[in-house]
């Protein structure tokens, strides 16, 4: 998500009005809690244009706390903007060069050039080992290849680096389901819904997992009403 030059100029003018006249002062203002709260209020209560700009601004200053709050709201349009902005912060967390390499790997994977994608992601991870999205994208490629154990390991690493990564929780849940680990699959999908509670595909996947777990426990003689861990 990119901010228009005109909008950035307006923000700089506002920063100047509140006394941030140096470049350092402007940047400090943009990353301040005051600015983030202001943009959050615009995101949840502004008109369509204001919401779009606010989402871009929150992505620009990497305001994950505000965006993680916004994706839980009841307003679908606000959630959609917040989710896009949040994922932008994750994809760009390691810098422009890393983002380009990540996009290249994703393009290769989309064309089913999976080994090429893995090779690119291996290099990226070696260079940027704390880049959570690189691990997550490699997990996705492993999943597409049916290499579920390796995908789970990469999802786990993603979550060490970014505990809020709902995509990693979702992916790990699906992989564990493929491995027959139904209880663990349910747990992972619940964790994803804690972060992204309105996501319908995850809700549907969890319902199916819980049905399978219910049948499994009934078959094994476990009380159907027992708590699903």
What are these regions (language model features)?
Residues 60, 88-92, 110, 144, ...:
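Register position in tetratricopeptide repeats
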